[in-house]
């Protein structure tokens, strides 16, 4: 979002590099959409409910326009994305928070500007035991791999009707759960969600009492500390890119429930492109007001926790690859060295 600074750098003859905090697949998608807009006047808003599929160079599989990311379905935001993508093409290089073993197709699809994959860049040190001891103690008391963790990011929240559907799904699934719920800000206010004073106000009557032996409802969650805990066996997530990388780093399979920004694309990549996730609703958009019913959520939770042995194996393998990428001689270690060499040589 600081691409205008590139103009200032040009005035002083300083080469510009972009750091891209999302994945390489979405970077390729951004550049592709900008290209077909300029060449064919592509307007994503016209295709959001169609069965059209896009052949995106950074993906192996066709991308359905019905799950276009929320970030490009607003006219003003789409214009901003186009301007940013054009600036990206002028950079001397793009540094991306990903690694070759995860997004090889996307990384290898880039020619100009060069892409440097230096991830996963994560802060995996957490003091969850000091800041949220009651959560960590509860997890300590659960069997290994038995808990599904539901958390939707710093901006993630649902309506009361949707919370009730999630509650019914969890109760009917019978699985142990740790569920972070947040109160949405008022409709006329741009703000982060807050914690509920009493979750009983928005959950089905008697839900907390009926599930007290298997579940815990919390407010804000120390996500890294929770994902690192051996009791966690699955993660229901909004698919923010950091959350995706964290789930892989700790080897926790993910069920995808995207909400905003580029998260629909991330969900597609995890479920269809990479086979590392389970779908709840890849096309869900928070602004749509659609309620995902409890049956659909329950099926996904059961699939995640009961029938995902192959995916679980793949996620565990990716966990090891994510760590290997960063060590001396690893793919991201080498790519970072290439970036440093290029930057130093000007």
Curated annotation (Swiss-Prot):
Pfam families: UDPGT. It is an enzyme of class 2 (transferase). An anthocyanidin binds at residue 261. UDP-alpha-D-glucose binds at residues 221, 223, 238, 241-243, 246, 262-263. Pathway: Pigment biosynthesis; anthocyanin biosynthesis. In the presence of other necessary color factors, this glycosylation reaction allows the accumulation of anthocyanin pigments. This is Anthocyanidin 3-O-glucosyltransferase 2. The gene is GT2.
């Amino acid at each position: 979002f600081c691409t205008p600074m590139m103009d200032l750098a040009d005035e002083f003859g300083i080469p510009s590099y972009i750091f891209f905090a999302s994945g390489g697949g979405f970077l390729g998608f951004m550049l592709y959409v900008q290209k077909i807009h300029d060449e064919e006047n592509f307007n994503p808003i016209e295709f959001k409910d169609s069965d059209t599929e896009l052949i995106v160079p950074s993906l192996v599989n066709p991308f359905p326009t019905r799950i276009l990311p929320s970030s490009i379905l607003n006219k003003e935001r789409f214009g901003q994305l186009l301007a940013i993508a054009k600036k990206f093409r002028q950079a001397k290089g793009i540094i991306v928070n990903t690694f070759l073993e995860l997004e090889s197709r996307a990384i290898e699809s880039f020619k100009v500007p060069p892409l440097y994959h230096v991830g996963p860049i994560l802060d995996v040190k957490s003091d969850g035991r000091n800041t949220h001891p009651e959560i960590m103690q509860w997890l300590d008391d659960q069997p290994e791999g038995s808990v599904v963790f539901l958390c939707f990011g710093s901006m993630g929240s649902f309506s009361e009707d949707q919370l009730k559907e999630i509650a019914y799904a969890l109760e009917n699934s019978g699985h142990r759960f740790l569920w972070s719920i947040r109160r949405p800000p008022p409709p006329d206010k741009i703000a982060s969600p807050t914690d509920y004073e009493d979750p009983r106000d928005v959950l089905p009557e008697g839900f907390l009492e009926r599930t007290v032996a298997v579940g815990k409802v919390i407010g804000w969650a120390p996500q890294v500390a929770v994902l690192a805990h051996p009791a966690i066996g699955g993660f229901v997530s909004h698919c923010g890119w950091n959350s995706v990388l964290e789930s892989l780093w700790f080897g926790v399979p993910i069920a995808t429930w995207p909400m905003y920004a580029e998260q629909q694309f991330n969900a597609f990549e995890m479920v269809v492109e990479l086979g590392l996730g389970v779908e709840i609703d890849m096309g869900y958009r928070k602004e749509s007001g659609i309620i995902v019913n409890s049956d659909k959520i329950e099926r996904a939770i059961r699939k995640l926790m009961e029938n995902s042995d192959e995916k679980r194996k793949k996620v565990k393998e990716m966990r090891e690859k994510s760590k290997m990428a960063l060590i001396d001689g690893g793919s991201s270690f080498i790519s970072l060295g290439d970036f440093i060499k290029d930057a130093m040589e000007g």
